[in-house]
């Protein structure tokens, strides 16, 4: 049980300190990719929603 809480604490701690990483800027040569990079974190959610749509299409067998 303690190991689980330790792991959760480590994960939360690392996300708090790496939050500045998420707000970093791309190098100037890749500035045209900014709109794509902004959308990229949402892409896994589309797959998650697709699973529900697929199950609804096959009537949740």
Swiss-Prot record:
Gene Ontology annotations for the cellular component aspect, listed alphabetically: chloroplast thylakoid membrane; photosystem II reaction center
Top-level taxon: Eukaryota
The keyword Plastid belongs to this UniProt entry's keyword annotation: yes
Keyword Transport: no
InterPro entries documented for this protein: PSII_PsbK, PSII_PsbK_sf
Transmembrane portions of the chain: 36-56
Keywords, alphabetical: Chloroplast, Membrane, Photosynthesis, Photosystem II, Plastid, Reaction center, Thylakoid, Transmembrane, Transmembrane helix
Residue numbers covered by the propeptide annotation in the UniProt entry: 1-24
One GO process term, biological-process aspect: photosynthesis
Membrane topology of the entry: Single-pass membrane protein
Localization, UniProt: Plastid, Chloroplast thylakoid membrane
Function per UniProt: One of the components of the core complex of photosystem II (PSII). PSII is a light-driven water:plastoquinone oxidoreductase that uses light energy to abstract electrons from H(2)O, generating O(2) and a proton gradient subsequently used for ATP formation. It consists of a core antenna complex that captures photons, and an electron transfer chain that converts photonic excitation into a charge separation.
Complex formation: PSII is composed of 1 copy each of membrane proteins PsbA, PsbB, PsbC, PsbD, PsbE, PsbF, PsbH, PsbI, PsbJ, PsbK, PsbL, PsbM, PsbT, PsbX, PsbY, PsbZ, Psb30/Ycf12, at least 3 peripheral proteins of the oxygen-evolving complex and a large number of cofactors. It forms dimeric complexes.
Classification via NCBIfam families: PRK02553.1 (NF002715)
Record-stated family: Belongs to the PsbK family.
Name this polypeptide is given: Photosystem II reaction center protein K
